[in-house]
Design a protein with these regions (language model features):
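Conserved short alpha-helical segments that host acidic/polar catalytic motifs at enzyme active sites
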Residues: 1-127
């Protein structure tokens, strides 16, 4: 089972999300990711491994915003062979959205074709 957290606050949420992910993780986790939103810009950091080794000080400084999502992944199918498979996912079409899901996608090939071959713009992403 994956761990998911969302926080909306009057203060920056990066540290609260990080602390929450530390509490949600356990052995078997293969990747983690945090996305924050500052005004209309998403800030994303994803990495393989455990939370305490995935985020450095510079990563946390870049995750500014008062809205954020965090995810720790426990593979039930496949594994995080690349950071691109870690969540949260950013989808640009039609306007830009960040999403996290807890489950197996059964139409991954169709989704991959749509996301990577058709919708290539990423205007709201800052990494």
């Amino acid at each position: 089972m994956c761990g998911i957290v969302e926080i909306v606050s009057s203060d920056d949420v990066n540290q609260q999300i990080y602390d929450s992910l530390l509490l949600l993780q356990h052995r078997g986790q293969d990747s983690t990711g945090i996305t924050t939103m500052e005004n209309t810009i998403f800030h994303i950091h994803k990495a393989k491994g455990h939370v305490n080794t995935a985020y450095r000080t510079r990563d946390m400084r870049n995750l500014i915003g008062k809205i954020g999502l965090g995810h720790v992944r426990y593979a039930t199918k496949g594994s995080a062979e690349s950071v691109e498979e870690a969540q949260p996912f950013y989808v640009n079409a039609p306007y830009g959205i960040v999403l996290i899901h807890n489950g197996n996608l059964t139409n991954t090939r169709d989704l991959e074709k749509q996301l990577f071959n058709v919708d290539k713009r990423h205007t709201h992403l800052k990494n």
